[in-house]
Amino acid sequence: VNFAIQTNGLMIDEQWAVFLAENRFLVGISIDGIKALHDELRPDAFGRSTWARVTKALSLLQKNKVDTNILCVVTRSCAKSPVKVYHTLQKLGGNYLQFTPCLDPLGKPRGSMPYSITPELYGHFLCGLFDEWYRDWQAG
């Protein structure tokens, strides 16, 4: 049996990190690209930045040898900076990176919401991301 959870990481502390490590969880942490974009999209209940707390939770999980997946929701704003997003998330050091397109609500035209992404823009983002990853891979 394998366990996996997805979280914003705000409630992860040492005790949780130890529990997740001992029980061999894969923990997905939601981090939406660069700091400014993440904080715009994922403020706390008081409208404050969550970047430092989320990245601290990720570090705590890594310190305890928990497998981690960084999930980035690709919004229209995020899609404009695939290279910056790649390097920001790669430096955080998750075991896996996952890029999920931000879609419109059902029944709405594609790309009609200010945050949603069209298939073309998502494809452009993924190609830019791949190209940068490939350059890194070639460089060793």
At which residue positions do the language-model features occur?
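Radical SAM enzyme [4Fe-4S]-AdoMet core and its adjacent flexible, acidic
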Residues: 40-52, 59, 63-140
